[in-house]
Amino acid sequence: MTHDFMIAFLTLELHIEAAQSLKDKRQVVRSLKDKLRAHFNVAVAELDATGLWNCATIGVVSVSSSRDYLDGLMKNVERQATRIANNGGADVADSFIEYL
């Protein structure tokens, strides 16, 4: 029995201009992660730069049997993440989607 499924992985590189400390950064990152989880059925985690107060790398993952569904989902997540980040004093400096 084989299962055909795809995994989509969105990476967001954030620059957090408003952060003056790690506490400020954590607040922005936590808000972004919580809002994306609540709005979309995705897994979200901070991946890199955990010790730097002005940047963060966020990973977003979803699994589906449909590439079209994943493509639309990840583009919507990316748009929403940009809005949330901008409202929290951060910018999405770079983003990319990978499929496995």
Regions inferred by a protein language model and the residue ranges of each:
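Residue-level signature of transmembrane alpha-helix interfaces in integral membrane proteins
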Residues: 31, 57-59, 75
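C-terminal structural segments of small proteins and small subunits
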Residues: 63-100
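Positively charged, small/polar-rich N-terminal and surface patches that mediate targeting and assembly
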Residues: 1-2, 38, 88-93
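Short structured motifs
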Residues: 44-45, 93
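Short, charge-patterned binding micro-sites
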Residues: 8, 45-66, 98-100
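N-terminal first-folded block
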Residues: 3-39, 43
